[in-house]
């Protein structure tokens, strides 16, 4: 289309909010800190309950199933399983609300 209303590259490019294909080092740093913060909260709850001589099934299950930040591979810290992706992995920053959702466990072999 020519004239005053012709297409420009940004207008014909699709989504306005583009997501880069890889996370920046600052996003990775914040992700590691979030994982450590959750680990600290779980440890604090576990210690407080241990002082009282009590246990909670949810905390025990979390400890049994979820790895800590130090135990996780970088692949698991920064990517998640997605069956629609070519290599079955996509960056965790492409997940909606990725800063609020705990994504620590992926299917075995992926």
Curated annotation (Swiss-Prot):
In this record, what's one Pfam family?
L31
Give the main location.
mitochondrion
List the subcellular locations: Mitochondrion
For molecular function, the Gene Ontology terms on record are: structural constituent of ribosome
Q: Which UniProt keywords apply?
A: Mitochondrion, Ribonucleoprotein, Ribosomal protein
Q: Which cysteines are joined by disulfide bonds?
A: none
> Which InterPro entries does this one have?
Ribosomal_mL60 (IPR016340)
- Highest taxon above the source species: Eukaryota
Example GO CC term: the record gives: mitochondrial large ribosomal subunit
Similarity remark: Belongs to the mitochondrion-specific ribosomal protein mL60 family.
Q: How does it assemble?
A: Component of the mitochondrial large ribosomal subunit (mt-LSU). Mature N.crassa 74S mitochondrial ribosomes consist of a small (37S) and a large (54S) subunit. The 37S small subunit contains a 16S ribosomal RNA (16S mt-rRNA) and 32 different proteins. The 54S large subunit contains a 23S rRNA (23S mt-rRNA) and 42 different proteins.
Query: What functional role does this protein have?
Result: Component of the mitochondrial ribosome (mitoribosome), a dedicated translation machinery responsible for the synthesis of mitochondrial genome-encoded proteins, including at least some of the essential transmembrane subunits of the mitochondrial respiratory chain. The mitoribosomes are attached to the mitochondrial inner membrane and translation products are cotranslationally integrated into the membrane.
Record protein name field: Large ribosomal subunit protein mL60
Q: What is the lineage of its organism?
A: Eukaryota, Fungi, Dikarya, Ascomycota, Pezizomycotina
């Amino acid at each position: 289309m020519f004239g005053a209303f012709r297409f420009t590259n940004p207008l014909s490019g699709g989504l306005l909010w583009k997501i880069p294909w890889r996370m920046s080092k600052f996003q990775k740093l914040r992700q590691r800190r979030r994982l450590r913060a959750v680990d600290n909260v779980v440890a604090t709850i576990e210690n407080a309950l241990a002082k009282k001589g009590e246990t909670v099934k949810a905390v025990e299950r979390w400890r049994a199933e979820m790895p800590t930040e130090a135990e996780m591979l970088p692949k698991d810290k920064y990517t998640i399983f997605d069956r629609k992706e070519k290599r079955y992995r996509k960056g965790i920053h492409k997940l909606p609300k990725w800063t609020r959702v705990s994504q620590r466990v992926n299917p075995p072999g992926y």
